[in-house]
């Protein structure tokens, strides 16, 4: 992904206190907080890193989320493995580009996304319907 933000894309809003909010952009959507709201249309079509202002004058920097941002801010249905633990797990597990991995209990998908970033090919098995 490069260039301007598009509808359907994830965006990371960061306020003046460095609080982070992961949002999926859509033309009718609005990001609401205690500091007013920002229509998604004021982000769609702009470049990452541009400031946007809420209706109450609060400023946010809007960026494309990294894998780490997504893992930290994602909704939690299962126990999440945090970025500080993911890299050592991949190293100990000898995950490398082209490795074939069978993952049982995919859960939130944080480990799967990290192994994919390392270039592994993953087959996952999840029994719980609410994690699919």
Predicted segments with their positions:
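Conserved SAM-binding loop of SAM-dependent methyltransferases across substrates and taxa
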Residues: 108-120
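Conserved SAM/SAH-binding beta-strand->alpha-helix loop
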Residues: 128
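Conserved SAM-binding loop and adjacent beta-strand
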Residues: 3, 72-87
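Conserved class I S-adenosyl-L-methionine
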Residues: 96-107, 123
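Short alpha-helix immediately C-terminal to the canonical SAM-binding loop
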Residues: 132
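N-terminal auxiliary segments of SAM/dcSAM-dependent transferases
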Residues: 1-64
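Conserved SAM/SAH-binding loop
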Residues: 82, 107-108
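Short internal alpha-helix immediately C-terminal to a glycine-rich phosphate-binding loop
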Residues: 84-101, 112
């Amino acid at each position: 992904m490069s260039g301007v933000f598009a509808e359907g894309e994830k965006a990371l809003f960061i306020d003046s206190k460095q609080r982070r909010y992961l949002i999926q952009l859509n033309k009718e959507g609005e990001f609401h907080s205690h500091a007013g709201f920002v229509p998604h249309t004021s982000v769609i079509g702009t470049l990452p890193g541009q400031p946007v202002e809420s209706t109450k004058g609060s400023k946010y920097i809007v960026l494309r989320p990294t894998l780490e941002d997504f893992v930290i801010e994602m909704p939690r249905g299962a126990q999440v493995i945090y970025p500080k633990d993911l890299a050592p797990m991949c190293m100990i597990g000898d995950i490398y580009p082209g490795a074939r991995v069978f993952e049982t209990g995919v859960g939130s998908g944080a480990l799967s996304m990290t192994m994919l970033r390392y270039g592994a090919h993953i087959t996952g098995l999840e029994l719980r319907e609410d994690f699919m």
